[in-house]
């Protein structure tokens, strides 16, 4: 083995904050469906604690063997709206508590899948689940929730968008951390290893291992070596770096799936930042020549980064999936936080950036008195970007505090300045409800 590659890898881990962000085990709960909610909960608990009992131990063993930090071990499950629909329960908080209890028992960091897919309309279980979200998140520590309100094939369910504006407000009122564990999607993917949007799709195998990597610091260090060179060189540098990062992700995923005796799913190519200095996507964009993220040129820089990461990653791994792109969560990226506080990055520019990257308005704090209709309208805008561009977009927004306040979440969730929003009303627009039809270019058959 080339000694240069060995020292490069050591440097990536020790100096540039490279880590495996998550090993996520997807578990199907379709065989746990029961008309009696108590029996369903017993089956759910038994299956998760059986299938995931060794996940944390195996993750720690691989981390120690390879010398690579594996930050989170997580589980995603079949959308609970499907599982709960067979019961006559009026809410699914009991199922959420069961998921939480199972997550604590096996020692994982988060469990995702308290979810509903309502892009074309509500079924019984969907409506019950959505109305259960505020209390489900308030009464659990590790449960994450997501709702898919639109898709390129179906259009946007504006009645669901309206409801989610209300649910986000209710969730914020019920618990300070609840909204950090709630994502509203368009074009949600079935094999996402990242929280809070992970759920195990019904088309997946019974149990699967998916891996998410994190390496903005590694990319930034590589770009420092080509300062002032053309964008051709920048793109090639990012591509080669993404190849190395993804190779390690694939190795970890294969080792984990072999030891756990389950199928290896995908590596998610997303560059996921943390609040630590030196682990920021914003600083990567600034390294390309921007004085501060949010200035003119930011969207173009992000487009180059996103595309080069995908090209490098696809060459390194035979199974790529999830969201796969650059994440731009405000609270989880110290460069984004600095740009918001300096006034160079606002909500409108973030929205433009979401037309490029793999997520939407992520971990953004807005004033607590923001009307539910304005939150719903933000969701509608993001869903429209995703639906028209045939890509995944999302909103994870936290109505808390007053404009200019700094909200502390702690850990990987970081801290977020409360951002200014447009005060003009969207209430009459949101009140219409109904369905925004699928775009003309969605008809492929």
Curated annotation (Swiss-Prot):
Belongs to the UPF0210 family. PANTHER family: UPF0210 PROTEIN MJ1665, UPF0210 PROTEIN SPR0218. Homodimer. This is UPF0210 protein Ccon26_06850.
């Amino acid at each position: 083995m080339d000694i240069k590659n060995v020292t490069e890898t050591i440097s990536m881990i020790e100096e540039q904050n490279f880590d495996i962000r998550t090993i996520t085990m997807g578990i199907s709960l379709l065989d746990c469906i029961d008309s009696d909610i108590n029996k369903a909960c017993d089956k759910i608990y038994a299956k998760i604690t059986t299938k995931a009992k060794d996940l944390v131990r195996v993750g720690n063993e691989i981390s120690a063997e390879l010398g690579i930090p594996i930050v989170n071990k997580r589980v995603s499950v079949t959308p609970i709206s499907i599982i709960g629909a067979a019961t006559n329960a009026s809410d699914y908080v009991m199922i959420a508590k069961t998921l939480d209890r199972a997550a604590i028992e096996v020692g994982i960091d988060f469990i995702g899948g308290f979810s509903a897919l309502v892009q074309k309309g509500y079924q019984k279980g969907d409506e019950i689940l959505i109305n259960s979200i505020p209390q489900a998140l308030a009464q659990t520590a590790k449960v994450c929730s997501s709702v898919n309100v639109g898709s390129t094939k179906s259009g946007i369910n504006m009645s669901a968008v309206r409801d989610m504006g209300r649910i986000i407000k209710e969730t914020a009122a019920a618990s300070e951390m609840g909204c950090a564990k709630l994502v509203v999607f368009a074009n949600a993917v079935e094999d996402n290893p990242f929280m809070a949007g992970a759920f195990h799709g019904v088309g997946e195998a019974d149990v699967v291992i998916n891996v998410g990597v994190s390496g903005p610091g590694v990319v930034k260090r590589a770009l420092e070596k080509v300062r002032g060179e053309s964008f051709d060189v920048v793109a090639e540098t990012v591509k080669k770096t993404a190849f190395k990062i993804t190779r390690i992700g694939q190795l970890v995923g294969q080792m984990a799936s072999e030891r756990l005796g389950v199928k290896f799913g995908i590596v998610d190519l997303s560059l996921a930042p943390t609040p630590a200095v030196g682990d920021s996507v914003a600083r990567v964009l600034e390294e390309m020549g921007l004085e501060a993220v949010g200035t003119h040129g930011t969207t173009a820089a992000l487009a180059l980064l996103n595309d080069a990461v995908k090209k490098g990653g696809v060459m390194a791994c035979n199974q790529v999936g999830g969201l796969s792109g650059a994440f731009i969560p405000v609270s989880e990226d110290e460069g984004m936080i600095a740009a918001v506080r300096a006034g160079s990055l606002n909500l409108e520019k973030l929205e433009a950036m979401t037309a490029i990257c793999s997520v939407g308005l992520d971990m953004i704090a807005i004033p607590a008195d923001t009307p539910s209709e304005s939150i719903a309208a933000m969701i509608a805008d993001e869903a429209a970007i995703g639906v028209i561009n045939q890509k995944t977009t999302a909103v994870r927004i936290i109505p808390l505090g007053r404009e200019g306040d700094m909200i502390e979440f702690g850990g990987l969730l970081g801290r977020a300045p409360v951002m200014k929003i447009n005060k003009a009303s969207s209430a009459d627009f949101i009140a219409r409800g109904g369905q925004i039809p699928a775009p003309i270019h969605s008809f492929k058959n």
